[in-house]
Amino acid sequence: MKIKFKKNDEVIVIAGSHKGKTGRIVKVDINNNTAIVKDINIVTKHVKPGQGNDGSIKKMEAPIHVSNLSILVKKATKTSPAQFSKIGYKFDKDNKKVRILRKTKKEI
């Protein structure tokens, strides 16, 4: 499965316990088809004490599968919900492959 998301894309979670939340992609893992989204899917990680450092409890973002994410077109307002779209590809005049929003046909 090809991952069409890139780092710093603004995405919305479309499925799961964090459905409807928006954020920016921090990291994309192409091997596991997952992405880490800033301030979404926060988990606590217990770090064992070792030589030279103390044990601690850290909060960090856990990865989300890319099938549960969609690119954000327009943020939600009081009167309208957030709009999101799938990502497609097309070739421009110079024969370069560019990413487009499938709903609006605009380049990203």
Curated annotation (Swiss-Prot):
Gene Ontology BP term (one) = translation
* Gene3D superfamilies hit by this protein: 2.30.30.30
A GO cellular component annotation here is:
ribosome
The protein's matches in SMART domains, at most eight in alphabetical order, are given as: KOW
The transmembrane segments are: none
Keywords associated with the record: Ribonucleoprotein, Ribosomal protein, RNA-binding, rRNA-binding
What Pfam families does UniProt report for this protein, alphabetically? KOW, ribosomal_L24
Q: Does the keyword Ribonucleoprotein apply?
A: yes
Q: Which GO terms describe its molecular function?
A: rRNA binding; structural constituent of ribosome
User: Main role?
Assistant: One of two assembly initiator proteins, it binds directly to the 5'-end of the 23S rRNA, where it nucleates assembly of the 50S subunit. One of the proteins that surrounds the polypeptide exit tunnel on the outside of the subunit.
Record's subunit section = Part of the 50S ribosomal subunit.
Q: Which NCBIfam families match?
A: rplX_bact (TIGR01079)
Q: What family does the Swiss-Prot or TrEMBL record give for this protein?
A: Belongs to the universal ribosomal protein uL24 family.
Q: Which HAMAP family match?
A: Ribosomal_uL24_B
Q: What is this protein called?
A: Large ribosomal subunit protein uL24
The organism's taxonomy opens as: Bacteria, Bacillati, Mycoplasmatota, Mycoplasmoidales, Metamycoplasmataceae
